[in-house]
Amino acid sequence: KEELEYKVINIDSNLSDQGIAEESVDIVIAAGMMNNAVNTDYSMRQIICSLVHGGIALIAEPVGENYELMLSQSFMMSRPTDAREVCNETFLKMEEWKEVFWGCGISERELVVVPSDTSPLAPLNQKLFIIRKE
């Protein structure tokens, strides 16, 4: 009988130090927290390394500056040390997200992004990044 195990993690710290071995996780669900990581590149690499082959990461995040979220969240967010610091932005743009994924070794065929740019939901500037590690 398989059991579901879940953990709350510190995304800014090494996952192996938190008891999560490389290639040991089947699924990661992260909603609205990657943009609060000190360094999104580092945190995403940690997540991808923790996934087993065939594992899935579901990452829901705003893309681009989202003034509604900035009004409340920017006061609680960590000071970034990644592309957001360089560009003085709160949230990564779509192209910056892709650079994060490509930098982690994720290929285009491993990544699905919804909603599409033509969706009625597109103006909300929220994306779900679905990654299946090969």
Residue ranges and their predicted role:
Residues 2-14:
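Conserved SAM-binding strand-loop segment of SAM-dependent methyltransferases
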Residues 6-9, 28-31, 59-62, 111-114, ...:
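Generic beta-strand/beta-sheet core signal
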Residues 12-17, 35-38, 64-70, 99, ...:
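Flexible loop/turn segments at secondary-structure boundaries
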Residues 15-28:
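A short acidic, Gly/Pro-enriched loop at the edge of an enzyme's catalytic core
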Residues 25-40:
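A short SAM/SAH-binding and catalytic strip from SAM-dependent methyltransferases
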Residues 41-56:
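A short glycine-rich, Lys/Arg-flanked "PGG" loop and its adjoining helix->strand segment in the class I
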Residues 58-104, 108-115:
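C-terminal alpha-helical "lid/dimerization" subdomain adjacent to the S-adenosyl-L-methionine
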Residues 104-106, 113-134:
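Core SAM-dependent methyltransferase catalytic element
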